[in-house]
Regions:
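Compositionally biased P/S/T/G-rich terminal and signal peptide-adjacent segments
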Residues: 25-61, 119-126
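Amphipathic N-proximal alpha-helical interface segments
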Residues: 45-51, 97-128, 225
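Active-site metal-binding motif and surrounding structural segment of the metallo-beta-lactamase
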Residues: 165, 178-236, 241, 346-363, ...
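Positively charged n-region of N-terminal signal peptides that target proteins for export
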Residues: 1-4
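Amphipathic alpha-helical segments
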Residues: 62-84
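C-terminal motif of bacterial Sec signal peptides marking the signal peptidase cleavage site
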Residues: 18-20
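Core dinuclear metal-dependent hydrolase active-site scaffold
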Residues: 122-200, 275-352, 418-444
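Binuclear metal-ion centers of metallo-dependent hydrolases, dominated by the metallo-beta-lactamase
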Residues: 133, 233, 239-292, 298-300, ...
Length: 444
């Protein structure tokens, strides 16, 4: 009888404990999923915040790395998880996400400044652990495409073949209604794809900015060839449409019109393809290429960007460094001097690169930035000025006269493809091609 009573007491106590635990669990409410406008305020420093469409940019000056780290802990305690961390020289970058929101933080110790970018979660860039593929040991190459458009002698289109035979495309060029340039791009992809490939695979299409001479080819390519290629993801970060209306209402055959066509193509032809908004500090892994984003337009705030100041699309260009096949390529788009000076100011030895793209077809430049990059090879996108730009401006003259620059390659007269890594013999190249023979329309 005593044993039976003991068993009953144990069962009653067990049920009570289980019930208490259940009640405790049921009473524990899940944390609220914080949206873009619900984030806790950064706890220190002098704060300045700007709303850009669906994105909030907060710049906190007079802060320390401990403040940056403490805010990360605050976000983690509020239901965020760390998506990625990156370190470039002494600068720290962290991306955190929840189901609704992405937060991108940076800390630049030279200015004791923390920047917080909050936006809807959207599609995310590929990290190292996401970059799963099988290399085919195919020679990586870099191709600069000559544009054929008669609208304007401007444009930029680069094609990088990766070691599995897929591609990264950067911009594309002006394009034209006759689809000459988009057909040229498609033919390059077909010719450089592995034998037997039914559809060329574009692992990433990156747009430096939204001017028509950079996105125009994409628009016509999408109409003619969207179902003849496979595209895995798009990467870009354009300024607001309001800025475009203020600064770029007419530029090289109406960039606003071309941007509207760009949006239409994205919606109509690629509704399910990820569209990643990339930011300063993102490290993107695409096959055997690793890309560090060094500058995106949010960092124009507050000096060149606020409720009254609107940057041009050139000023909003991305700057990023591609590491591939043991070499590095610095891409600048049409960036203006402010952006070049920004990366020169905040980055140190990491700017050194083997290949440099001259900014804005050679029309924007910075001696400090170019000398920090200190390239061995220089690429000049399609330019109405041709090689004349090498005689204009201290930055371009520095590149022209630098003893470390072995070759300047331009794409105004022809498409050019080089292997990566690129290490030609001196006998195979000339630093500046002989204008009187190779470029008869140009007198150097």
């Amino acid at each position: 009888m005593k044993k039976l009573l003991a068993v009953v007491i144990i069962l009653v106590l067990s049920v009570g404990v289980f019930s208490a635990c259940s009640n405790k669990s049921n009473n524990s409410e899940p944390k609220e999923v914080l949206k873009v406008d619900q984030l806790p305020e950064f706890p220190s420093g002098v704060l300045d915040t700007l709303k850009q469409d669906d994105m909030y940019i907060t710049r906190a000056t007079q802060t320390a790395i401990d403040d940056y780290n403490a805010y990360i802990e605050t976000l983690l305690s509020n239901g965020f998880v760390t998506y990625s961390k990156n370190q470039i020289d002494d600068n720290s970058f962290t991306t955190l996400v929840n189901d609704a929101t992405r937060v991108t933080l940076s800390y630049f110790p030279k200015e004791f400044t923390t920047t917080i970018i909050a936006e809807p979660k959207g599609d995310l860039f590929k990290r190292k652990q996401d970059n799963k593929y099988k290399s085919k040991n195919i020679q990586s190459t870099f191709t600069g495409m000559k544009g054929e458009t008669v609208i304007a002698q401007e444009g930029m289109g680069f094609i990088i073949r990766l070691d599995d035979g897929s591609f990264i495309i950067i911009d594309g060029g002006m394009g034209d209604p006759d689809s000459i340039d988009s057909t040229k791009l498609y033919n390059i992809l077909k010719e450089q794809s592995p034998e037997g490939t039914k559809k060329p695979r574009i692992a990433a299409w990156i747009f430096t900015h939204c001017h028509g001479d950079h996105i125009g080819v994409f628009n016509t390519f999408s109409i003619d060839y969207h179902n003849k290629v496979d595209i895995e993801a798009f990467y870009y970060n354009f300024q607001t449409e309001e800025s475009m209306q203020v600064k770029d209402d007419f530029m090289l055959d109406d960039s606003i019109y071309r941007y509207n066509q760009f949006k239409k193509a994205m919606k109509e032809y690629y509704p399910n393809v990820p569209k990643v908004r990339i930011h300063t500090g993102d490290k993107v892994y695409i096959r055997n290429a690793v890309i560090d984003v060094l500058f995106s337009y949010e960092y124009l705030f507050p000096n060149r960007l606020d409720e009254e100041k609107h940057p041009s699309s050139n000023a909003a260009s991305l700057i990023f460094k591609i590491n591939i096949a043991g070499q590095s390529i610095m891409i600048t788009g049409d960036i203006e001097e402010y952006g070049m000076n920004f990366v020169y100011k905040y980055y140190d030895s990491y700017l050194k690169s083997d290949i440099l793209q001259m900014a804005h077809h050679g029309m924007n430049q910075s001696v400090d930035f170019y000398s920090a990059v200190d390239p061995t090879y220089v690429i000049l996108p399609l330019s109405h000025a041709w090689f004349e730009v090498l005689n204009k401006g201290e930055g371009n003259i520095w590149l022209r006269d630098s003893k470390n620059v072995r070759q300047i390659i331009e794409f105004s007269s022809q498409s050019v493809s080089i292997p990566l890594p690129y290490n030609p013999l001196d006998s195979e190249i000339e630093k500046i091609p002989n204008a009187s023979t190779k470029y008869k329309d140009y007198q150097f």
